[in-house]
């Protein structure tokens, strides 16, 4: 052996403990068999490689145990923190299991190699004075360093080394050892440890007694409980809107200031919420698997493709009819694999991307409604629905139409209202060809042709085409009138009736016909009026085939075939099939009463 090699080895004393990774009995129990096998393989190879360098040290007891195929802690008794290596000095450590497990993931990659030069100092510049030189000075060698942060002291016979919790065999990189060489600091490599997957799952110990949602931290549970109690301590000074969390208030204030602190590094687009930025970043990283058949443009989300297709619908409305589903270039099976949904509902088989979405959905089957209104006692399955409902009592309408100034309690209602001004209609009924502005409206409209009425009243058995009509009907049985006019105090069963009534005080007529300029106080009146210009008569009698512009006209006409006469005169008891006929009949009694008064006088 060359003198410079012997001199190099005399400068630094290396023992097996320097490169061994130790586990306590409890930590060893948490390793799965594949991890234990990998640990055994790496430790034996490290010992073999270290022994081949010719350093003088005794064979550790743990190596003998591993070579016999036994587990380190199988026959050992844990006593005062001793490791399976045997108590070669005092070992004190506060290193968490999670750190060791993170280290374990890179143990295989960072095992020792034969004929490698070593430096166990603190990461400073290494000047070996021509030591560690092999016969071929041009040979590339890989310098290995042990890097540490927190204190873990191992007392040795020759030296005291101070290490830390991120104990790891750090591969610094291949360098040419010739003359004067330096060692790079391995701190820059620590990010590889942090990026390793965590083996240990964190227990969610804090559980909500109302909805059973679990949280890791008690503070998160306290914030969540405010959704049930309705507590709102943080108020906006601009619009007086209150929030249960300070973070929600900060985000809300950005709607007033226009601040957008979250900027995309890819395209420079700015966002007011971090969640919006995260959602936007997917457009740069996700595979664009939804392709428009018209122009070939691709999108990462089906909703993006659907909105894009509306552009083609405006250009060629007769050719394009999106129908109920947006078309994509992928088959149904491929779409399932490209966007996995791992949470399955056992009741109906629907799948969801998150456990919270599954919990919300399951309340449909269980009927659970944990969020209750403190004003009227009405309960909801989601906190967002409760917040929107509370605006009925407070009168708050934060979403305002820029065209006519009308306010709404939710953004979805505002979007539906805007269609009145734009006239956009992208959904065509296959039966009558009627164009509708939303998919949900198309589904409800189609029930007119099919006669389907899935929403049934449990009290009287009456059925309705939509759930909102059922809710309004049920208030007839309960007597509930939650909508009150602030001008005259009159109450109503539905919000639309209140809105229509309030226009009698203001004289407002926001619905304007683009054909003749005539204005109306109600959207239904405008819709009926438009049929005069278009000649549309969508309501057809199944008995005689006669068509009508209004559903009320069809109902009145059908009484001719059925013979039903629901309107009775309170004076003489005569029956009529239409209200207008009863009104005309009343005039006979009024004229008779006036004649009798004149005769008596």
From Swiss-Prot:
InterPro entries: KRAB, KRAB_dom_sf, Znf_C2H2_sf, Znf_C2H2_type
SUPFAM superfamilies xrefs: beta-beta-alpha zinc fingers, KRAB domain (Kruppel-associated box)
Cross-link (Glycyl lysine isopeptide (Lys-Gly) (interchain with G-Cter in SUMO2)): 150
Gene Ontology annotations of biological process type: negative regulation of transcription by RNA polymerase II
Domain KRAB: 14-85
Localization per Swiss-Prot or TrEMBL: Nucleus
Keyword terms: DNA-binding, Isopeptide bond, Metal-binding, Nucleus, Repeat, Transcription, Transcription regulation, Ubl conjugation, Zinc, Zinc-finger
Family, as annotated: Belongs to the krueppel C2H2-type zinc-finger protein family.
The protein's name in its UniProt record: Zinc finger protein 354B
Source organism of the structure: Mus musculus
Lineage, uppermost ranks: Eukaryota, Metazoa, Chordata, Craniata, Vertebrata
Name of the gene: Znf354b
